[in-house]
Each structure stands twice: as structure tokens, then as C-alpha cells.
Amino acid sequence: PGVPDRAFINDIRADLHDTDTVYVALDNHKYGDFSPYLLVSKNRGRSWKKITNGIPDRHLVWRLVQDHVRPELMFAATEFGVFATFDAGKEWHKLSGGMPTISIRDIQIQRRENDLVAASFGRGFFVMDDYTALRDIDPDDFDTGAALFTPRDAYWYFQKRPLGYRPKGSQGDSLYLCLLYTSDAA
């Protein structure tokens, strides 16, 4: 729907949670068209729907990645940064977090730590550490202006000092031993 015939396919992603759903990111910038083209099919490609609401004009979409836990949470790498949707593409929101406004050409999720990794065009890569709080966002809560999230379990680290290991090393606090070895040249 509304995609030029000669648009280039940047990314095709099968839905991680629904075998009938597929996403496609396209661009037509070689013909002077910088519009975002991001489509979804919920019937294995027989029909398509555009899902770019909230992604501004002239923001090419390069890649798309879906959260492996919450199906509605997705991230799009665009010409001017990263966007997130919390409702399966009905509305997109720009993520910044100090990342410069640059072309993000690839985006992946590191599943073990739930990190979002975004690679730019010429500026390096950026990591959003442990984005699991984003899974708790309800799109209806955007009008409130603030939200509290449940933190993940954390470990409290206590340094163990079985032999003291203070200023005098393994000798404890009360004993300091210095040995000097010399060779007899007799």
C-alpha cells in the first residue's frame, strides 16, 4: 500500500511470536523518496498494512527487531535514530538517551542481558543496557508524564577478606614482615 514498485527491501523479519506475521522495511531514497516504508502482513504476505505512524517523513527505515518476550515491543533503526513501538506498530516513539541524531543502520537484541545494540553509519555503536523496563510500558500511560518500573533482581556484593587483606596484604593488620635476601660472595 503506497510503496513504489522499485523500492529497495532493507529488512524482512518474521514475527517471533506469530508464524503468520511478517514485517518488511523498504526505502526508495535512490529515487529521491525518503519516506519511511514499514509494512506488516498478518496473513503470510497476502495483504499488507503500513505501520509508520509516529515515524516522521524523511526517516528511512533500515532495520526492525522485535522483543523476544513482549510481542508488541519493537525497535526500528532509521536514518535519524531509533524508534520504539509498544503496541505492535500502531504508534512509534523516538528513543534518544543521549544517542546523537545519526543514521542507525543495524539493530539487534542481545537476549541474555536484554541489551538493545544499535550500529550507526560511521559513528560506532550504542548499547541500551537492560531495556526490560520498556516491556512494562503501557501506551495509555504516555499522558501521565512519569512512570515507575519494577527493577530486576540485583546482587549485593560484599568483598570477602579471609586473611585480612588490608594495608599489609595477607599478613593481617598486626604483622608486617620484610625479608631481604643477599648472596654471599665469599
Which residues does each predicted region cover?
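Short beta-strand segments of immunoglobulin-like
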Residues: 174-178
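Beta-propeller blade termini and top-face loops
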Residues: 1-173
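Conserved small/polar residues in nucleotide/adenosyl-binding loops
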Residues: 181-186
